Design a protein with these regions (language model features):
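N-terminal low-structure segments adjacent to metalloprotease catalytic domains
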Residues: 1-28
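Juxtacatalytic substrate-recognition/specificity segment
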Residues: 31-163, 170, 174, 180-184, ...
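Active-site rim elements
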Residues: 59, 203-211, 222, 234-237, ...
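Active-site-proximal structural scaffolding
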Residues: 65, 164-167, 213-217, 229, ...
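Alpha-helical scaffold elements that line and support the substrate/ligand-binding pocket
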Residues: 145-154, 171, 213-233
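Catalytic-site signature segments of enzymes, centered on catalytic residues
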Residues: 155, 190-217
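Short helix/loop segments within enzyme catalytic domains
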Residues: 178-201, 229-241
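Beta/coil-rich, acidic/histidine-enriched accessory regions frequently appended to metallopeptidases
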Residues: 242-278
Length: 278
């Protein structure tokens, strides 16, 4: 059985208090997931809040089992199973994060501590406590789960590491693929479009980890899928190449005789005239 209270290494750059380690309590176990919540935060919730959180995690567990896991693995490939911890369940650690963060993924966790000293030695993702009863929680889980698929498909199977912009582009597209952006108001997509419009001249492939970066890669992924189908994201993920070269290979696989720079230029023009029929 999984331990009730566990000490986890966390990313101080995302943590609300810049901590590197926290104690977390196991709140829920499903067939697929362990939900751990930062102990001090959980203990400070009143019983009604704790009840609301338990209900939210029940719903999220069902959504993961019935939709997120099957849709994303069938489109993009498998995660490491049973992986570094020998357990088919994925750990979801919920802790207090800075306000602009919904979650994160640490690829080091899938390696042993000999290879990655701060590894938690689990297949796991991190979600913000601030999102836990929000409609954006499922989008955040889908996004981070795609990073777990990516580390398996690229780093573990192909022995290459994806470029950040394309890794984020695929993860950003997942809420749309799952139908979570269908109601545009309050969606991840709406947030990203606003961020992009704040800084529409941002580079697509030079990653600075700003909201505008996420906006740019989200819109580029939307454009790619609108024109070439979700296979363009999947084929480039399963390629031994990374970044631009993997997108070009995926285009060629479909018989599209265009370079990345041509596709990029067409996207830029479509943005300029705001006509996605182009």
């Amino acid at each position: 059985a999984a331990s009730q209270t566990v000490s986890f290494n966390i990313d101080s750059s995302y943590d609300l208090f810049s901590r590197q380690e926290i104690e977390a309590e196991l709140i829920r176990t499903t067939q697929d997931l362990y939900f751990y919540i930062e102990k001090s935060w959980w203990d400070s919730r009143n019983s009604q809040e704790q009840n609301d959180i338990r209900l939210a995690l029940f719903d999220l567990g069902e959504e993961f089992r019935n939709k997120i896991y099957p849709v994303l693995t069938s489109n993009f490939g498998s995660i490491p199973e049973p992986g570094i911890d020998g357990d088919q369940r994925i750990t979801v650690l919920i802790h207090q994060m800075r306000q602009d963060a919904g979650g994160y993924f640490n690829s080091g966790d899938v390696y042993s501590r000999l290879q990655a000293p701060r590894s938690n030695e689990r297949e796991m993702v991190y979600l913000s406590a601030g999102y836990v009863t929000s409609s954006k929680l499922r989008s955040a889980l889908a996004h981070e789960f795609l990073h777990l698929i990516t580390v398996n498909q690229k780093d573990l199977l192909q022995k290459v590491t994806e470029e950040v912009w394309l890794n984020e582009a695929r993860a950003e597209y997942t809420p749309t693929l799952l139908g979570y952006d269908d109601a545009y108001a309050g969606s991840n997509l709406e947030t990203r479009v606003r961020a992009f419009l704040d800084n529409p001249t941002i580079s697509l492939t030079e990653w600075l980890n700003s909201g505008s970066d996420y906006g740019a890669v989200n819109l580029f992924a939307q454009y790619l899928v609108d024109h070439y189908g979700v296979r363009i994201l999947a084929d480039s993920l399963q390629s031994s190449k990374v970044g631009i070269a993997s997108v070009e290979e995926a285009l060629q696989k479909q018989g599209v005789k265009k370079s990345f720079s041509q596709v990029f230029a067409e996207w830029a023009i479509a943005l300029l005239v705001n006509d996605c029929r182009l």
